[in-house]
């Protein structure tokens, strides 16, 4: 009984690792021009404050990822993630967050 449970857990764990490595992630996609412009605006608004830039970049990154599954999250989702908003493209459908969401 114990051996079979250990083997089952090992197989499930390996399957998870393989799927995770092969899944397309948001970070793997090239940044769209509209997202790059949003980052430039964040730098401009931070006025040289590196901490504010970091916070703004993290918010943009989080919103980009969250917009992939929910285009109504923020009004600028179509700019942050044009792959998925307003219409999901084939690339969008391959993303790990879209498949699991």
Swiss-Prot record:
Keywords, sorted A to Z: Disulfide bond, Secreted, Signal, Toxin
Location(s), subcellular: Secreted
Family: Belongs to the scoloptoxin-10 family.
Domain of life: Eukaryota
Protein name as catalogued: U-scoloptoxin(10)-Sm2a
GO CC terms in record: extracellular region
Main subcellular localisation: secreted
UniProt note on tissues of expression: Expressed by the venom gland.
Modification after translation (UniProt): Contains 3 disulfide bonds.
Keyword Disulfide bond: yes
The keyword Ribonucleoprotein appears for this protein: no
Signal peptide: 1-23
GO molecular function list: toxin activity
